[in-house]
């Protein structure tokens, strides 16, 4: 009888252990993944202002139980709140002229612990460039009555200014890449 008790106990224990999840991480919904990406950007980017979700593009298939890599795309915008204030994002309004960042995140659940790599780039630079080109065209029309030599010098310096501006913007507007492990 005593042997029967231990055999039964062993079977129950084996079934209990076998019934637990074999996932190395807890299930992560798409909304939780987006929130995690935004909070990671706010904590690791080195920016002074907090950023809040502007738009998230849900993937066709987000599997919260997946052990493979998952991708997410989102757009965040600068808020009036500072990182040092440690306020809730719901309390923070967007800045009127705040920076808008397009972000792509990759969750690597096959790693132990899981890893998030987030790449964010500023958006909206093309609109500024188009506006500058329109202003230059208007200036050229106004300068048609000037001597040829003056026109050439102005054109040369405009090209030089545009080239320097483009290089400076490119230098300072590099994408931010943030990689973190996710403690579960």
UniProtKB/Swiss-Prot annotation:
Which GO cellular component terms, listed alphabetically, does the Swiss-Prot or TrEMBL entry include? Answer: extracellular space; membrane; other organism cell membrane
The primary site where this protein sits is secreted
List the biased-composition ranges (Acidic residues): 125-144
Q: What intrachain disulfides are recorded?
A: 81-92, 103-120
Give the propeptide segment as residue ranges: 23-150
| Expression across tissues | Expressed by the venom gland.
Which InterPro entries does the record cross-reference, listed alphabetically? Cathelicidin-like, Cystatin_sf
Set out the biological process GO terms recorded for this chain's protein: defense response to bacterium
Signal peptide extent: 1-22
Q: Where is this protein localized, as stated in its record?
A: Secreted; Target cell membrane
Tell me which Pfam families the record gives: Cathelicidins
Specify where the region named Disordered lies, as residue ranges. Answer: 125-147
Assigned keywords, A-Z = Antibiotic, Antimicrobial, Cleavage on pair of basic residues, Disulfide bond, Membrane, Secreted, Signal, Target cell membrane, Target membrane
Q: Which family does it belong to?
A: Belongs to the cathelicidin family.
Further information: The putative mature sequence has been predicted by AMPA, a predictive algorithm for identification of peptide stretches with antimicrobial properties.
Which function does this protein serve?
A: Potent antimicrobial peptide against most of Gram-negative bacteria, some Gram-positive bacteria (Bacillus) and some fungi (C.albicans, P.pastoris, A.terreus, A.nidulans, and C.globosum). Adopts an amphipathic alpha helical conformation, that may allow to partition into the target membrane. No hemolytic and cytotoxic activities have been observed on mammalian cells.
Protein name per its UniProtKB record: Cathelicidin-related peptide Pt_CRAMP2
What organism does the record attribute this protein to? Pseudonaja textilis (Eastern brown snake)
């Amino acid at each position: 009888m005593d042997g029967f008790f231990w055999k039964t106990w062993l079977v129950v224990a084996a079934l209990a252990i076998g019934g637990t999840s074999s996932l190395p991480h807890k299930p992560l919904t798409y909304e939780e993944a987006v929130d995690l990406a935004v909070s990671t950007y706010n904590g690791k980017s080195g920016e002074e202002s907090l950023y809040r979700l502007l738009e998230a593009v849900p993937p066709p298939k987000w599997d919260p139980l997946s052990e493979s890599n998952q991708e997410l795309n989102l757009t965040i915008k600068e808020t009036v709140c500072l990182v040092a204030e440690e306020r809730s994002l719901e309390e923070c309004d967007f800045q009127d002229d705040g920076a808008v960042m397009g972000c792509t995140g990759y969750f690597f659940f096959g790693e132990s612990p899981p890893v998030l790599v987030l790449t964010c780039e500023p958006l909206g630079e093309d609109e500024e460039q188009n506006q500058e080109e329109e202003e230059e065209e208007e200036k050229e029309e106004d300068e048609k009555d000037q001597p040829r030599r003056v026109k050439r010098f102005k054109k040369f310096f405009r090209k030089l200014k545009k080239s320097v501006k483009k290089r400076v913007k490119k230098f300072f507007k590099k994408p931010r890449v943030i990689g973190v492990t996710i403690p579960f």
